[in-house]
Curated annotation (Swiss-Prot):
It comes from the Bacteria. The gene is add. GO terms for biological process: adenosine catabolic process; DNA damage response; hypoxanthine biosynthetic process; hypoxanthine salvage; inosine biosynthetic process; purine nucleotide interconversion; purine nucleotide salvage; purine ribonucleoside monophosphate biosynthetic process. This is Adenosine deaminase. Catalyzes the hydrolytic deamination of adenosine and 2-deoxyadenosine. GO terms for cellular component: cytosol. Inhibited by reagents such as p-chloromercuribenzoate, and by coformycin, a structural analog of inosine. The keyword Zinc applies.
């Protein structure tokens, strides 16, 4: 189902949601951190989704073990490097990794700015080693409030040339986008792109707000757009992309089953929507699974899957020249 003549991308992928269970085990031992299990086999049910979670917040608790073992900046550097290694192993040509340095720093009170620097270093070294092209998206974790998001923003701005875009993630219902207008004004002043998690836990009004008030060029998940025909028309007309994450939306109980997922309808409506993983380490999936198992189960035809693959590159936060070069590089292989 993957067209090997086209670039394969993953533009909604959380770096801090893709920490290998084996790495959690090893870092736990290295830093004497108490884990819920002492073997890989018994640890996996604690750090990966085995059955669908009742809601998004329950799903997010699975991520916590991954960041609890980040006891040093070297550990942060390691997981960033391994994210690129994983991307290469799964055949990705281009990946946008998003991360919340405040979340990664929290368990061991690491310096937030230091986490940003460590992630940049690890990703840079991974790209050199494995030949994958990557860009970084800074996440503000709204769940921790405006002040914590401000701290994350300042850390990103200290490395503004290595950050491509700003995102807002976390508790969408408890912390609406309206609380973060000034943060996104500064992001646009820095020349960054904007993508926002919206329409996952909250309704279509959250997506409208992300676009109109925060300046979103892309929407993370965006499943609730299906409830608003005018919004779907607007997304198609303005070419505002939806970063679809099929398996994730089932595991968080955002969508009941793959057959009911709105991605097929979005594509039929002319919306620029792509296929992505979200938190592959926690979900126990990879991009190949999303294309070859999840997308057909969601009712997508072979041509629709190919269109979603094309959309992934078109939506990417790359210049027209960078996109052309990537297309030519893949076609030449």
């Amino acid at each position: 189902m993957i067209d090997t003549t086209l670039p394969l991308t993953d533009i909604h992928r959380h770096l801090d949601g893709n920490i290998r269970p084996q790495t959690i085990l090893e870092l736990g031992r290295q830093y004497n951190i108490s884990l819920p299990a002492q073997s890989l086999e018994t640890l996996i049910p604690h750090v990966q989704v085995i059955a669908n979670e009742p809601d998004l917040v329950s799903f997010l608790t699975k991520l916590d073990w991954g960041v609890k073992v980040l006891a040093s900046l070297d550990a942060c550097r390691r997981v960033a490097f391994e994210n690129i290694e994983d991307a290469a192993r799964h055949g990705l040509h281009y990946v946008e990794l998003r991360f919340s340095p405040g979340y990664m720093a929290m368990a061991h009170q690491l310096p937030v700015a230091g986490v940003v620097e460590a992630v940049i270093d690890g990703v840079r070294e991974g790209c050199r080693t494995f030949g994958v092209q990557a860009k970084l998206i800074g996440i503000m974790s709204r769940t921790f409030g405006e002040a914590a998001c401000q701290q994350e923003l300042e850390a990103f701005l200290a490395h503004r040339d290595q950050i491509t875009a700003l995102d807002l993630a976390g508790d969408e219902l408890g912390f609406p986008g309206s609380l973060f207008l000034s943060h996104f004004n500064r992001a646009r002043d820095a020349g960054w792109h904007i993508t926002v998690h919206a329409g996952e836990a909250a309704g279509p009004e959250s997506i409208w707000q992300a676009i109109r008030e925060l300046g979103a060029e892309r929407i993370g998940h965006g499943v609730k757009a299906i409830e608003d025909r005018a919004l779907m028309d607007f997304l198609a007309e303005q070419q505002i992309g939806i970063e679809s994450c099929l398996t994730s939306n089932i595991q968080t109980s955002t969508v009941a089953e793959l057959a009911a997922h709105p991605l097929k309808t979005f594509l039929e409506h002319g919306i620029r929507a792509s296929i992505n993983t979200d938190d592959p380490g926690v979900q126990g999936v990879d991009i190949i699974h999303e294309y070859t198992v999840a997308a057909p189960a969601a009712g997508l035809s072979r041509e629709q899957i190919r269109q979603a693959q094309i959309n992934g590159l078109e939506m990417a936060f790359l210049s027209a020249e960078e996109k052309r070069a990537l297309r030519e590089k893949v076609a030449a292989k």
